[in-house]
């Protein structure tokens, strides 16, 4: 053996015999507690926060030894027993001191209500926001806030219903019960239309120019009927080959045809279908749908009607405090244990050494809290707020892991928890709900030819914008008091002031071919929308002067969209095949899937920014679900064929979720955690499509980093927020119009050298090619389209910079190969001729976008992605 080989062998043996760090202590025993725990003298581990907290958590009391006397901070309230609690917890209706001194009448009666608050009476210690008085809800524990309120007086442009409710005068005698008691439709004269109007069979009036234009504007479609026009209306929609067209015009997936669930508005997908039968390995629900047989009686409602969990029997009959299970399998009554008679085949009910022995008398049975003596043996139990972690030791329960245990903020305490509210909200002590302080929140929703508003407290129901054509999408800039909506018939996005009594509205963005949804960025003052015809997601300034396609690939049926400018992310749903919900940076980077499983028709999505969750409606599964903003912690809120027959859009405020159902033509509300407390807010709608909450707390204020140091961030075209992935993420990036690339300075735009042909992502049956005109730097108008090809900047400086490093790496690799070849010649080897097959897969190109440190303004390096294949649906 050569000298080099012997040295290598000695080195190998030294490495093998070297002592390893296995976490052993000097005494050879493993440390039981980690860095976040305190080790008691008896070896037990407790959380470090429990040391010197005044409670003996170690059974030997070692956690309270050698403790420095604790003094409360200036921001704390000192309980009579010396305990410290935050000042804001004093007189909040919830005792936090162990002796209850923070809620003592002596302390709380001396309390003075703050500005914009009212007292609940001389005998009450409670203060509530002034805006909660006479809002229809008892917020004071004695109900004093709803006393002496008087009758609600409607304004001059409103009608007073028999119930006292106020509705818009435009709703009177319109053929719809808007009062919910029919009083707005009493004593109505036969409706007449003007000289330039057409009267539908339902008696409603539409402009004469809307008749026979192949777009049904009457709810009964009488303006496009064969009798009126002398021909059938021309349906312009052409469905992809993977979809079928309903009699009512819309497209649905082919696989939804004859599945027992009407998906078309007119139900034509379930006409002339063969009778359905379930396979032998399936269970047939009462509604006719089929589920796998293994899902029956599994404790989960898999059938929409819940019929799979009806008449289920518990196979384990040996449960409960009055039963004892023998080791031999029998189940006997607990009274037969230790009665000196054999009831179990194996005599396990009569163990000689265990009967009538109280193990709890010695060291509490080893239990850290409670020891319960049983007929045979014993069991440990814990005090409220704790749970067994090893059959003997009790640990704190983190109640904050339970969804909905607190309305907004949950603080886990030892043996309990504390609920708090976010800024701008105050807890209603009667319900535990964090209610908004300030103006009354309201729901605003589209009703095809108008936009309506209903107050959530006083239920005032009015018309905001009228004489519209076909409104399908809606959002608002609440701070600016502006509404934005998309009109399918006019292929445009409009805006209006919410307080405009004249009824003026303005066209902001044109050439929006089939808008599905819009989302307003209230911080950076842009608007995002999905287009179902061009299969794109676009962004534009609110005035419409600058716009571009943000995404134009891998979109099949883009639907709802929502933005969070505070974190720089945009979210959207796509009910194409496969259906999914995605998220990406609002600048078009860091695109990733959020929900891809158990999802079929995700129509509406909305963000709960307070709880950091995304909610969505699935019209096919008749389900309302939610996930956190990383796609984790998925929960089903509500599953209902009745209330979620064909849900279209939803919105969230406080502890309630509200949605529009197209089939029921109604607006519903429910608890956002449990799906309970279902309520109907509005009925008798006419093709309502979208809904939002209007309240200043829905759109929290944030900093517009594009206007922090220089106008528009120094960008020549669009300045868009970047996704805040970590502390080093840039705040914004510059973006160019379609057909232009960013220059190396990351701010200016230059035209691509090669002309680009643009066309929409389309099926082979589609004949029209959609194009749109966009304003580009220098005031040049170019015809742009859905696809975009980016050309990377040319240059060789980067290659010369890395050449020395490359040569060094090559030299090192060459030296290693020479050494291995020399070693191979000096070693005996054995060769096996068995072939080895490697599975290779073609991976998608992954591009890592470099980011610099925490500069406010920053741009991503240019990226080139060239696609030559059409994305056929």
From Swiss-Prot:
Where are its TM segments located?
A: 798-819
Q: Which GO terms describe its cellular component?
A: apical part of cell; cell surface; clathrin-coated pit; extracellular space; glutamatergic synapse; membrane; perinuclear region of cytoplasm; plasma membrane
Q: Which residues form the EGF-like domain?
A: 356-395, 396-435, 702-750
Per the record, the gene is Vldlr
Spell out the protein name for this chain.
Very low-density lipoprotein receptor
* Cited InterPro entries: 6-blade_b-propeller_TolB-like, EGF-like_Ca-bd_dom, EGF-like_dom, EGF-type_Asp/Asn_hydroxyl_site, EGF_Ca-bd_CS, Growth_fac_rcpt_cys_sf, LDL_receptor-like_sf, LDLR-related
UniProt topological domain (Extracellular) ranges:
28-797
Which Gene3D superfamilies is this protein grouped with? Laminin, Low-density Lipoprotein Receptor, TolB, C-terminal domain
Extract one GO molecular function annotation from the record: very-low-density lipoprotein particle binding
């Amino acid at each position: 053996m050569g000298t080099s080989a012997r040295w290598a062998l000695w080195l190998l043996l030294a490495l093998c015999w070297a002592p390893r760090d296995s976490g052993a202590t000097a005494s050879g025993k493993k440390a039981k507690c980690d860095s976040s725990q305190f080790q008691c003298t008896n070896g037990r581990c407790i959380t470090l926060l429990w040391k010197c907290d005044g409670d003996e958590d170690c059974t030997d009391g070692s956690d309270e030894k050698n403790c420095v006397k604790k003094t409360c901070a200036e921001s704390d309230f000192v309980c009579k027993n010396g305990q410290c609690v935050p000042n804001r917890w004093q007189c909040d209706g919830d005792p936090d001191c162990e002796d209850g001194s923070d809620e003592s009448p002596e302390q709380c009666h001396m309390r003075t209500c703050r500005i914009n608050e009212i007292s609940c009476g001389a005998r009450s210690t409670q203060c509530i926001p002034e805006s909660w008085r006479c809002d229809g809800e008892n917020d004071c524990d004695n109900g004093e806030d709803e006393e002496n309120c008087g009758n609600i007086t409607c304004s001059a442009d409103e009608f007073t219903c028999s119930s006292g409710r106020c509705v818009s005068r435009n709703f009177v005698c319109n053929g719809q019960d808007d009062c919910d008691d029919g009083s707005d439709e009493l004593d109505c004269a036969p409706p007449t239309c003007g000289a330039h109007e057409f009267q539908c069979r339902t008696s409603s009036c539409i402009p004469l120019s809307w008749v026979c234009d192949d777009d049904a504007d009457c709810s009964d479609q009488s303006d496009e009927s064969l009798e009126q026009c002398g021909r059938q209306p021309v349906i312009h929609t052409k469905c992809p080959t993977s979809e079928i067209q309903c009699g009512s015009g819309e497209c649905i997936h082919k696989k939804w045809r004859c599945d027992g669930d009407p998906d078309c508005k007119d139900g034509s997908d379930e006409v002339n279908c063969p009778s359905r039968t379930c396979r032998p390995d399936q269970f047939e629900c009462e509604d006719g749908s089929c589920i796998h047989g293994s899902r029956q009686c599994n404790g989960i409602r898999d059938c929409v009607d819940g019929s799979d969990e009806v008449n289920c029997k518990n196979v384990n009959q040996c449960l409960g405090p009055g039963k004892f299970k023998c080791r031999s399998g029998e189940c006997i009554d607990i009274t037969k244990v230790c009665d000196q008679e054999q009831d179990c085949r194996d005599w396990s009910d009569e163990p000689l050494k265990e009967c009538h022995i109280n193990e709890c008398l010695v060291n509490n049975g080893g239990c850290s809290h409670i020891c319960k003596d049983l007929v045979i043996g014993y069991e440990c139990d814990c005090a409220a707020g704790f749970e067994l972690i090893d059959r003997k030791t009790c640990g704190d329960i983190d109640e904050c892991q339970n969804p909905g245990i607190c309305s907004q903020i949950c603080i886990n305490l030892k043996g309990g928890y504390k609920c708090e509210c976010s800024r701008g909200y105050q807890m209603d002590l009667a319900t535990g709900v964090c209610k908004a302080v300030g103006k009354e929140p309201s729901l605003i929703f589209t009703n095809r030819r108008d936009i309506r508003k209903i107050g959530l407290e006083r239920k005032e129901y009015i018309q905001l914008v009228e004489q519209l054509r076909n409104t399908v999408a809606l959002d608002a800039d609440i701070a600016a008091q502006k509404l934005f909506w998309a009109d399918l018939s006019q292929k445009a996005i409009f805006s209006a002031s919410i307080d405009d009594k004249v009824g003026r509205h303005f066209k902001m963005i044109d050439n929006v071919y089939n808008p599905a949804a819009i989302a307003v960025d209230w911080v950076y003052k842009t608007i995002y929308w999905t287009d179902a015809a061009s299969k794109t997601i676009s962004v534009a300034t609110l005035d419409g002067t600058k716009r571009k396609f943000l995404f134009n690939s891998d979109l099949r049926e883009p639907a709802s969209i929502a933005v969070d400018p505070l974190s720089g992310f945009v979210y959207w749903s796509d009910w194409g095949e496969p259906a999914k919900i995605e998220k990406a940076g609002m600048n078009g980077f860091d695109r990733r899937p959020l929900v891809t499983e158990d999802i079929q028709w995700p129509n509406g999505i909305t963000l709960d920014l307070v709880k950091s969750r995304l909610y969505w409606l699935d019209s096919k599964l008749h389900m309302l679900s939610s996930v956190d903003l990383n796609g984790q912690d998925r929960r089903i809120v509500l599953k209902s064929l009745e209330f979620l027959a064909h849900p279209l859009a939803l919105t969230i405020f406080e502890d309630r979720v509200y949605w529009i159902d197209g089939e029921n033509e109604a607006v519903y509300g429910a608890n956002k955690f449990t799906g309970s407390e279902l309520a109907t807010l509005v009925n008798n709608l006419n093709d309502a499509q979208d809904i939002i909450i209007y309240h200043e707390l829905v759109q929290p204020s944030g900093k517009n980093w594009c206007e922090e140091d220089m106008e528009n961030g120094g960008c020549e075209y669009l300045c868009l927020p970047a996704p805040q992935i970590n502390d080093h993420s840039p705040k914004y990036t510059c973006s160019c119009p379609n057909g232009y690339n960013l220059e190396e300075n990351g701010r200016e735009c230059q035209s691509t050298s090669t002309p680009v042909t643009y066309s929409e992502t389309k099926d082979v049956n589609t004949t029209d090619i959609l194009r749109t005109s966009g304003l580009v730097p220098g005031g040049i108008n170019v015809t742009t389209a859905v696809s975009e090809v980016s050309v990377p900047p040319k240059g060789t400086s980067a290659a010369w910079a890395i050449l020395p490093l490359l040569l060094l790496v090559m030299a090192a690799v060459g030296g290693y190969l020479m050494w291995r070849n020399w070693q191979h010649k000096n070693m005996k080897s054995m060769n096996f001729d068995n072939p080895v097959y490697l599975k290779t897969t073609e991976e998608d190109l992954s591009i890592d976008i470099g980011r610099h440190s925490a500069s406010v303004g920053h741009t991503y390096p240019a990226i080139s992605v060239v696609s030559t294949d059409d994305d056929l649906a």
